[in-house]
C-alpha cells in the first residue's frame, strides 16, 4: 500500500505534487473563475450538464479511465475558489476493435456508476418529477414519470359501492330506543293524562276552593276528586297531587307545634319570672 501511494513532494511552493513515473498526477489548488477547467459545464439553472465530447485514446495504448468531480464555485469576498480533483485509477487493457466501439461512461465520484444524476435537488425539474440521464458521449435524456401515482387509481366500482351500502344498512332493531319516554295514558274516568308533569301555578280562586275542600275532607274519593277537578278546570292528577302535598304540610305543622307545646310544658310556671315575683 505504501509502495503504491509513494508520492514525493516536489515544488512545494506551487502546491503541485509529482508522483512516480507510471502514475497520474493528483492536483489540488485554488483556481480562479477564469482559469478553472472542468470537463462538465455548470448551467445557470443549477444543474450539471454533460460533457460535449468523450476522451479517446490510441488503440495501441491502454485505456485510462478518469473521474472528474466538479464542484460549484462559492464566492467569498473578492475571490472565487473552486476545486478540481482528478483521480487516476482503474487501468483497462482493451483490444483496438473494442476501444473504437467502447462508450466512455461518466463514473460517480465515489467509484460507482449506478446512480444517475437527478434534477430533483434544484431547478424546475424538481417540480415536474423528472430525471436527467447523462452519458459519456454527450447525450442527455430526460426521463419523466407521473407526479402522483395515487391520483390515477381507478374509481370505485358500482358493486363495491353497493357492498359498502349493504354493510352500513340500519336495521329495525337498531332504531329501538333503550329508554323509551313514558306516555301518559287515559285516566280512570276518561280524562287524558299529561306526558310530562309540569308544576301548576294555581290561581287564588282555585287555592281557596281547594283549601275549603281540605278543611272538610282531607281525603277525597274518586268521584269527589273528579267533581272538584271539573269545577276548578283542573285534571284529576293535579287535584290528587295538591291534596298529597297539603297533607304533608299539615303533618309538618302538627309536628312542629307538638314540639313547641312540649317545651312549654317542660318549662312550667315555676321557671317563669312572673311566678317567682308573685311568690312572698
UniProtKB/Swiss-Prot annotation:
Residues 195-254 bind DNA. GO terms for cellular component: nucleus. Keywords: Developmental protein, DNA-binding, Homeobox, Nucleus, Transcription, Transcription regulation. A motif (Antp-type hexapeptide) lies at residues 170-175. InterPro entries: HD, HD_metazoa, Homeobox_CS, Homeodomain-like_sf, HXA1/B1/D1. It comes from the Eukaryota. The keyword Ubl conjugation does not apply. One of its GO terms (molecular function) is DNA-binding transcription factor activity, RNA polymerase II-specific. It is found in: Nucleus. It holds the Pfam family Homeodomain. Its main location: nucleus. Residues 261-280 have a biased composition (Basic and acidic residues). Residues 46-65, 249-280 are annotated as: Disordered. Belongs to the Antp homeobox family. Labial subfamily. Sequence-specific transcription factor which is part of a developmental regulatory system that provides cells with specific positional identities on the anterior-posterior axis. This is Homeobox protein Hox-B1b. The gene is hoxb1b.
Amino acid at each position: 500500500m505504501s509502495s503504491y501511494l509513494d508520492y514525493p513532494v516536489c515544488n512545494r511552493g506551487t502546491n503541485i505534487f509529482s508522483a512516480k513515473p507510471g502514475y497520474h498526477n493528483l492536483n489540488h489548488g485554488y483556481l480562479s473563475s477564469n482559469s478553472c477547467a472542468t470537463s462538465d459545464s455548470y448551467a445557470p439553472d443549477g444543474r450539471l450538464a454533460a460533457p460535449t465530447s468523450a476522451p479517446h485514446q490510441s488503440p495501441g495504448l491502454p485505456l485510462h479511465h478518469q473521474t472528474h468531480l466538479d464542484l460549484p464555485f462559492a464566492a467569498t469576498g473578492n475571490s472565487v475558489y473552486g476545486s478540481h480533483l482528478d483521480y487516476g485509477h482503474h487501468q483497462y487493457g482493451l483490444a483496438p476493435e473494442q476501444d473504437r466501439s467502447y462508450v466512455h461512461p461518466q463514473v460517480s465520484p465515489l467509484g460507482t456508476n449506478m446512480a444517475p444524476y437527478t434534477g430533483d435537488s434544484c431547478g424546475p425539474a424538481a417540480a415536474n418529477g423528472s430525471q436527467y440521464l447523462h452519458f459519456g458521449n454527450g447525450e442527455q435524456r430526460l426521463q419523466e414519470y407521473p407526479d402522483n401515482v395515487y391520483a390515477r387509481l381507478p374509481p370505485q366500482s358500482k358493486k363495491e359501492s353497493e357492498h359498502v351500502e349493504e354493510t352500513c344498512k340500519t336495521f329495525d332493531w337498531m332504531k329501538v330506543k333503550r329508554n323509551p319516554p313514558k306516555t301518559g295514558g287515559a285516566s280512570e274516568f276518561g280524562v287524558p293524562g299529561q306526558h310530562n308533569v309540569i308544576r301548576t301555578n294555581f290561581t287564588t280562586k282555585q287555592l281557596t276552593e281547594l283549601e275549603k275542600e281540605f278543611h272538610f275532607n282531607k281525603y277525597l274519593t274518586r268521584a269527589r276528586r273528579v267533581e272538584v277537578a271539573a269545577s276548578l278546570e283542573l285534571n284529576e292528577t293535579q287535584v290528587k297531587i295538591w291534596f298529597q302535598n297539603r297533607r304533608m304540610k299539615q303533618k309538618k305543622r302538627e309536628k312542629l307545634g307538638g314540639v313547641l307545646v312540649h317545651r312549654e310544658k317542660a318549662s312550667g310556671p315555676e321557671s317563669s319570672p312572673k311566678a317567682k315575683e308573685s311568690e312572698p
